[in-house]
């Protein structure tokens, strides 16, 4: 839960909201000055990684305000079938292509999505006090959860969506983590819980 709260309290954030027949994208800024020269990248991606549609729009994150910057007609943007098999990936990037904020929007609750079976590839670097795990999946892995049997271990992120072919780096820190011990951890995603 606190991983989502971190995103909510970031100085600049994105919110994707479906109202009536529109998909509205908002930029929320707590900064006291405008952030200019930003690009809003919006992509419709199926769960196997095919980019169905992609658009880019120049935007400004106005100071200390929440503002709708894009509105898409759902019926013109995505078919009924695609709604159960795709995600809208929204990113706000600066002029150096650094991601300022991101958000993934699913048209249905997870139990109504056609989540694919997938395996998450991982590579791990072990150091005393810190494990660094790089994750990648060919298909969408929804609600990925990493767990390690050490009380109080700190994660830089957890319980996230791993989009097809994207890499995600997770760091786990704790004084109890030893390079030589290679303490085992588990990685699960929502589709693995289906029977």
Regions found by a protein language model. Name each.
Residues 143, 184-187:
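Extracellular/lumenal ectodomain signal focusing on beta-strand-rich modules
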């Amino acid at each position: 839960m606190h991983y989502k709260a971190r995103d909510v309290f970031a100085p600049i954030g994105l919110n994707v909201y479906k109202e009536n027949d529109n998909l509205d994208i908002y930029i929320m800024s707590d900064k006291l000055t405008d952030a200019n020269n930003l690009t809003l990248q919006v992509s419709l991606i199926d769960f196997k990684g095919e980019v169905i549609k992609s658009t880019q729009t120049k935007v400004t994150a106005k100071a200390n305000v929440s503002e709708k910057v894009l509105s898409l007609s759902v019926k013109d943007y995505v078919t009924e079938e695609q709604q159960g098999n795709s995600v809208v990936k929204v990113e706000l990037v600066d002029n150096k292509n650094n991601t300022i904020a991101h958000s993934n929007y699913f048209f249905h609750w997870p139990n109504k999505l056609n989540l694919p079976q997938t395996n998450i590839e991982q590579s791990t670097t072990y150091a005393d006090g810190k494990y660094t795990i790089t994750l990648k999946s060919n298909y969408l892995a929804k609600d990925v959860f990493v767990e390690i049997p050490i009380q109080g271990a700190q994660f830089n992120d957890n319980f996230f969506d791993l989009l097809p072919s994207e890499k995600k780096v997770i760091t786990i820190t704790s004084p109890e983590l030893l390079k030589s011990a290679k303490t085992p951890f588990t990685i699960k995603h929502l589709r693995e819980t289906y029977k």
